[in-house]
């Protein structure tokens, strides 16, 4: 949980974008995410430099000798016009390459069509200065800070997306009691709220008494020290998220990284479509122990592109019915799911509704 001072800093940063002419909440969060990532890369580079110097070893740098001007610690000191030019013409293209670090490469996957929407030099300077003062080196705090930023997404998008309230997400995760050796998926992940909460649930549940510490305002922090045996699985194979909104994918990847999942498996994919089974045959059926979801229930649907395994069981264009059918396909034998659906799924009287309820029984 972040304190009032940090909330005030985030609010001020948000207002700066709005007064600077960027008023779409998703765009604001996306642009802040880009800047946060630029700073995180530089912080990681500085940490690796110090560790290598102390151990008298070498490491593969993110920024080569000819790329030092692209580091946050260098471009943040430029004048407004120069900063905008360097960020727009050099830093952003650099993000779109495949840099040496896993962190840069992972986020770079979602940068192909990314654009710097900040056109006013004064706005960029203000945003950079504010982000430079945020505590991005503090484990729990940086994740909570991003969660607070995401809480500003309160309205539905054009695809029927909206952010599930945090307390609902937490309830659903606690009901399913995911274990650290299991696999967890969200087929319409949005900002990855369910996956992040699963990670936090594991941190809370698998922390010894000695691994809990309390800060000055009484907030408990959980080290997850009892998860060490599962750390490799958690980092590389436990979580899978899918969405077909590229902006959401960027935000989801950043959200996961800030909450301790260094290599988030977040993929651009419409999970109802034919291409899902073609691209990810090992993930598209009988693949997961736990599926958590709040899939979109509005928006357009190309019925011709929906996979036959779904349409064959529930002949409908209603996405809420198709997603439930999909989730049943995704689950392993004995798997479990918590999914938010409209009440019509349980009480509708169409043939598709009845067929789905028979499957659920």
Language model features: what each stretch is:
Residues 1-180, 253, 265-274:
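Non-catalytic, mostly N-terminal accessory regions of nucleic-acid modification and defense proteins
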Residues 39-45, 153, 192, 202, ...:
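A generic secondary-structure signal for well-formed alpha-helical elements
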Residues 161-290, 298-300, 317, 321, ...:
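Conserved S-adenosyl-L-methionine
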Residues 331-337:
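Short glycine-dipeptide loop
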């Amino acid at each position: 949980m972040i304190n009032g001072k940090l909330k005030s800093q985030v609010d001020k940063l948000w207002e700066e974008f709005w007064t600077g002419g960027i008023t779409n909440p998703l765009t604001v969060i996306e642009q802040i995410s880009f800047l946060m990532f630029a700073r995180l890369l530089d912080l990681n580079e500085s940490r690796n430099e110090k560790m290598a110097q102390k151990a008298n070893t070498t490491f593969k740098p993110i920024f080569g000798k000819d790329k030092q001007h692209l580091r946050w610690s260098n471009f943040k000191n430029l004048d407004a016009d120069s900063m905008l030019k360097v960020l727009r013409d050099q830093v952003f293209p650099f993000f779109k390459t495949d840099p040496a670090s896993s962190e840069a490469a992972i986020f770079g996957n979602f940068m192909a069509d990314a654009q710097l929407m900040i056109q006013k030099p004064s706005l960029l300077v203000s945003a950079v200065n504010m982000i430079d003062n945020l505590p991005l080196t503090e484990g729990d705090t940086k994740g909570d800070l991003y969660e607070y930023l995401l809480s500003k997404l309160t309205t539905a998008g054009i695809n029927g997306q909206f952010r599930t309230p945090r307390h609902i997400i937490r309830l659903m995760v606690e009901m399913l009691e995911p274990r650290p050796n299991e696999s967890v998926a969200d087929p319409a992940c949005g900002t990855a709220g369910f996956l992040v909460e699963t990670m936090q649930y594991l941190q809370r549940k698998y922390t010894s008494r000695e691994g809990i510490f309390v800060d000055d305002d009484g907030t408990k922090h959980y080290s997850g020290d009892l998860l060490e045996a599962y750390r490799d699985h958690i980092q590389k194979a436990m979580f899978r998220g899918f969405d077909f909104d590229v902006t959401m994918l960027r935000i989801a990847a950043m959200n996961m990284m800030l909450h301790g999942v260094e290599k988030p498996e977040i993929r651009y994919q419409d999970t109802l479509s034919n291409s899902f089974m073609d691209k990810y045959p090992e993930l598209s059926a009988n693949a997961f122990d736990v599926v958590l979801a709040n899939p979109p229930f509005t928006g357009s649907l190309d019925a011709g592109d929906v996979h036959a395994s779904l349409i064959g069981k529930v002949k409908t264009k209603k996405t809420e019915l198709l997603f439930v059918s999909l989730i049943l396909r995704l689950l392993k034998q004995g798997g479990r799911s918590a999914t938010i659906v409209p009440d019509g799924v349980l009480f509708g009287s169409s043939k598709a509704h009845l067929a789905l309820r028979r499957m659920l029984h």
